[in-house]
Structure formats: structure tokens, C-alpha cells
């Protein structure tokens, strides 16, 4: 019931030095991407945070192509023509939680990947009661971390995988790409409008 899929990949050569330079300044970008203009829209969005000395490198084009491929894969999985895209260095999910979405795709390109636990290693009642992480995790030796460049798709909702931002990413920079179905953005916007009224 508590589903997750993780596709393991090797970190390509040149990634470490490229992202080390990119992470010198914090950033966060988001937008809606469509299958029709995906390559162009993605490039325009990412250009906002890429220094000139990095945008001319071969690895930059490799990274853009990788993000495009992952985005197109998620569009097929979700059977939709658009998706919500987020890319940033700041991750602030300290407490274990589940995402309020059917599925979410995560790729950590630099830094430590998302921390997660199997359901049998978690106290779901403690989680539902709002207890701290120490009460939610039954055994710290059972913690899992998504490796850099691996593609993770987590089921959300009440049967979602419990996960959080690891301490290393809370206290230092990393680069995470997050993809959601466009209905997620609509639901968040609707809830914000309701709060204002």
C-alpha cells in the first residue's frame, strides 16, 4: 500500500564541480511546463539561475537534457500534458510527512537525497498525533536516503511514504528537482484563495 519507486542512476562525470559552482548562491524557481514547449520552457526557466560561465559548459546542456527526459517520463506516468516544476537549493521539510498529492517525483542532483522510512519501521500513530521525528522513527538504523541522480516517485496521501529533508540538506545547500501533477498547484491556489475570503 505504501508505494515508492526508485530508479537508480550513476552520477555523471563533471556533475560535482558544476553543481558546487551553481550552489554558491541559493535559488528556487518554479513554473508550469507543458509537453508542447517543454524543452524551450525548461531552458527559459532554468536560465534565471545559471551564471554565464556555467551556461556555456557542455555539462549544462547535458543536465538540461536530463531534466527534460525526466519531465517527459513523469508526463507519461501522470497521463497529463502539463506538470508543476520546482528546482531549488533550500529544503525545509524537517518533520517526517506524506505529500498531499497522488504521486511526486524527486531527483536530488547535488547534496544528500531525501530521507525516508519503510512503513514497518515507522510509528504511524506517533506521526498522526504530531509527535516529533524521534517518536516516529522506531529504529534509526532503518533510515533510507535517495542517492544523488536517482529518480524517486513517492505515493502521497494517507498511504504515502513518510519522508523528510535530511539534516545535511537542512543545514547546507543541495539541489532538488520536484515534479507534481498540475492539479496540485490548482488545489494549493484554491486553498489559499479560501483562506483569504
Outline where the language-model segments fall:
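Short beta->alpha connector loops
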Residues: 88-91, 157-159
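Gly/serine-rich nucleotide phosphate-binding loop at the start of the catalytic core
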Residues: 8, 12
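Active-site environment of non-heme Fe oxygenases that use a 2-His-1-carboxylate facial triad
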Residues: 86-87, 95, 109-119, 181-183, ...
Amino acid at each position: 500500500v505504501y508505494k515508492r519507486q526508485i530508479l537508480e542512476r550513476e552520477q555523471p562525470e563533471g556533475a560535482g564541480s558544476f553543481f558546487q559552482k551553481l550552489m554558491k548562491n541559493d535559488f528556487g524557481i518554479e513554473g508550469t511546463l507543458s509537453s508542447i514547449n517543454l524543452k524551450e520552457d525548461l531552458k527559459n526557466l532554468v536560465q534565471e539561475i545559471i551564471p554565464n560561465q556555467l551556461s556555456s559548459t557542455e555539462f549544462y546542456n547535458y543536465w538540461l537534457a536530463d531534466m527534460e527526459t525526466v519531465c517527459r517520463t513523469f508526463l507519461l506516468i501522470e497521463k497529463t500534458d502539463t506538470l508543476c516544476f520546482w528546482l531549488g537549493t533550500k529544503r525545509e521539510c524537517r518533520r517526517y510527512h506524506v505529500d498531499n498529492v497522488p504521486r511526486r517525483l524527486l531527483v536530488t542532483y547535488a547534496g544528500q537525497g531525501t530521507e525516508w522510512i519503510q512503513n514497518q519501521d515507522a510509528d504511524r500513530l506517533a506521526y498522526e498525533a504530531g509527535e516529533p521525528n524521534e517518536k516516529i522513527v522506531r529504529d534509526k538504523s532503518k533510515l533510507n536516503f535517495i542517492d544523488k541522480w536517482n529518480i524517486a516517485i513517492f505515493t502521497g496521501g494517507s498511504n504515502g511514504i513518510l519522508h523528510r529533508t535530511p539534516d545535511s540538506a537542512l543545514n547546507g545547500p543541495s539541489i532538488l528537482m520536484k515534479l507534481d501533477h498540475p492539479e496540485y498547484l490548482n488545489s494549493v491556489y484554491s486553498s489559499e484563495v479560501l483562506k483569504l475570503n
